[in-house]
Amino acid sequence: MHLLHPHLPTRRAFLKRSGQLAMTGTALPLVLNLAAIGEAAAFDATDYKALVCVFLYGGNDYANTVVTYDNPSYNLYSTIRNGGAGQAAGGIALARADLAATVLNPATAPVDVLGQSRQYALHPSMGGLAGLFNAGHAAVQLNVGPLVVPMTRAQYSSTNRTLNPLPPQLFSHNDQQSIWQSSSPEGSTVGWGGNIADLALSGNSNAALTCISVTGNAVYLSGDTALQYQVSTGGAIKITSATAPVYGSSAVSTALNSLIQQTRTQKLENEYNKVTQRAISAESSVTAALALPQPATVFPAESLGQQLKMVARLIKGQATLGVKRQVFFVSLGGFDLHDNLIAKHPALLAQVSAAMTAFYNATVELGVANKVTAFTASDFGRTLASNGDGSDHGWGSHHLVVGGAVKGNAFYGTPPPVSVASTTAPADQWHVGQGRLLPSTSVDQYAATLAKWFGVADGELPGILPNITHFGGAGYPVNLGFMA
């Protein structure tokens, strides 16, 4: 659990409840705390870098996203998922022949815990990301999930939770979304993206625009000092009382603007005025940045494509925004596919692939490919076993990291054996039932690797990722190695 500054919870609670200007009914687009007078940063950046979290809400099915392709492993996968004869599609298994165009060809083939060489392909709808992987601009981190400490199947089955603590509320959507984003279950107020941003605030002349969400509120972007500014795919959310007549009267608008400039003796009123002033200032800065010519790269028209297009436009305008470090959050829902997996999953993955590919191409166009890293996250993985028409809540999952600074065309981590059995055989020790992967890489390690690339010093990591001190060494390295 994060230890919060004693003065922040009350202020943060007030700011989060301040969604409307009471007199005007005008929504504030951000939860801006006193970012401008925040704690000293751990680093003062001289270049530009951005992290972009692509969150897949609902729990993505890992087995049909990064699909085992070598013949022995594929045959096990197909049998477990009720595939057809001769490696044909069936049940919730994909046909092996349909994976030929999206086979991943790393420089070095990954070897699983049993010493067997493995091969993977992406889902057939993910041709764009497969191309980026094979060109060296994307990597796969295998079997990531929340862990408090390194965990074996025997330790998972133990009743001694003092020695073998588990993440709370495993398999629960809301809690696992929160744990992925903040290391704490539902109700957490501080996320690791926001805590990374805390350390960069003083290097940004406009600190309020360090953390930006294009998909609504997310705890991932809330720091101890930094909080998120929210935009839509259409741009800045306007404070209409500052830019248009209120109740048809310019005089009322002028009066309201005058009121928020006044210093108040009542602390709550004073803080409210400061928040509103920053919201108006941030809106003005974002509008100016978005007035620049848009990137020529064509983005998909679907939701995720348009969210990432907005991120690309904001990155293009980073000098206008006055920022050198930024953390973004975008998302796509619909991945909780207990049924209709074969029918619905392809379109979702197609969105992810097309949007992330277009986004990478835009960073190349803007000359910032080496300075921007996008990565996937999700509530949890899912069962390898079929429930008849879909898969159920799981734990570990495979994730993609994309960008010019990514050491791509490679797999990181250890491939788990393809298994749903519950014997004492070595192949059966890497899941916790029904093929729910027991993570061999923690979210803390995944986040730490991204944070270090962003500029966070080793000594700052425990303040951002509370469990990172439980990991280290060859088996659970703090730096997973996928960033240059």
Language-model-detected regions and their locations in the chain:
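Generic beta-strand/beta-sheet core signal
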Residues: 331-333, 375-377, 402
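Hydrophobic, well-ordered secondary-structure elements that form the walls
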Residues: 379, 399, 450
